[in-house]
Amino acid sequence: GWEKLISERMYQAYARNYGVDVRIARFQNTFGENGTFRGGREKSPAAICRKVAEATESIDVWGDGRQVRPFIYIDDLLDGIEALMQSDYQEPINLGTDDSITITELAEMIIDISGKNLKINYISGPTGEMRRNCDTARMKEVLKWEPTRPLRESFEKTYKWIEKYL
């Protein structure tokens, strides 16, 4: 929102006025091990991993499951940050992926990873925007970088980590 945009402008002004070397990265929907997975502050990948790990018959998903999101694994994001820090680029830049999946596809993938036979219940709740995309053209052009880790493999690691700590 506005607070992010104003912060970006403030960092750029600070760079101009004081000669500070600044990089501004706009992160996508990040997931991975060592993140929050309970308590109401977790994002959908961690919440779904936790729900699947705890479930015996079904999981609840807010909305109709058709919401589309691009997800980036934390290790890929860290590689992107490193590429940005090694560059001279000082304008805001999106760090993310062009690949998006629906929340239903995400839930089905996590259920498959778990080896369980679970049903998905769609319930009323906050769903956010139906589709969120991230334009990564500048990232690819300027940084000569893009995420490389397969989504399923990354979710396998995340699921196993969350399952271990439940």
Which residue stretches match the model-derived regions?
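Short-chain dehydrogenase/reductase
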Residues: 1-8, 38-46, 70-71, 100
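Active-site Tyr-X1-5-Lys
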Residues: 1-26, 47-56
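ATP/adenylate-binding site constellation spanning eukaryotic-like Ser/Thr protein kinases
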Residues: 8, 27, 42, 89, ...
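Short, function-defining helix-loop hinge/capping sites that tune catalysis or transport
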Residues: 12, 34-37, 143
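Flexible, glycine-rich beta-alpha linker
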Residues: 23-44, 68
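Amphipathic alpha-helical recognition patches that constitute DNA-binding helices
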Residues: 26, 43, 47, 102, ...
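C-terminal substrate-binding subdomain of Rossmann-fold SDR/epimerase-dehydratase oxidoreductases
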Residues: 54-166
